[in-house]
Amino acid sequence: MWGDAQGRVQAASLPFRLSGVDITKDMSPAAVKCAVEQARNAGMEHLPRESGFLLTLEGSQVVCALIPSVMPEGLSARELTRMEQELREQAVSYAAALKRYMPGMEHSELVMIGPSIGLRETRRLVGRTQLTGEDVLSGRRRADGIARGGWKPEIHRSMTKMATYLAVKEGSWFHIPMGALQSETLENLYGAGRMVWADDTAFAAVRVMGTCFATGHAAGVAAALQADLGQMPCVEKVRAELQKQRGLV
């Protein structure tokens, strides 16, 4: 299925890097928002998102800007091209806006734009067990867990506002059930990473790279065991093999 139950997906992004930045100045989202507002009022275009994060590297004059965003409407070559063009236009515009209106950016230069669009969400597998937001936020542990997640839900639904962040129970982590990786209707078809069967809130936590590694490992082990056994493996066998391979379950 495409996106969530309403057919919505999270915004895609393309970071860019600036050099020559005085990182002793305020690099907060609030400072970015102030600069973007001034740029918009001055008539600058291709600035849809009001703010974003500037990631600094201590002791350097380099920042990575996480601002340009676009809402995917499919994965055709035409649509991917449209998004790439739009995001690169945004990156150039945001770099110019920050240079002109944000203190500390007066001598900044655009040195790099990400090599390709970052897609947070597209199609998902319809699985046998749905991971829920409550499972994630409460740090639920379960006997059928085959991977762990610890990233808090990070929801990028708006093209104009910054992401919404929800806190996982402090000091905790949550299990991802084997059924969230298994197709509801097709034998020995598994999905991992952004394919995991999860509701909107849970998906915003499991789509990140570290958790994708864990679910990919689990899906591969489960599918291989099923191919060897000729039948669906029990979760205990999958967990045991993952632990044998030093997986954290």
Label the predicted regions.
Residues 1-249:
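Flavin (FAD/FMN)-binding glycine-rich loop and adjacent Rossmann-like elements that form
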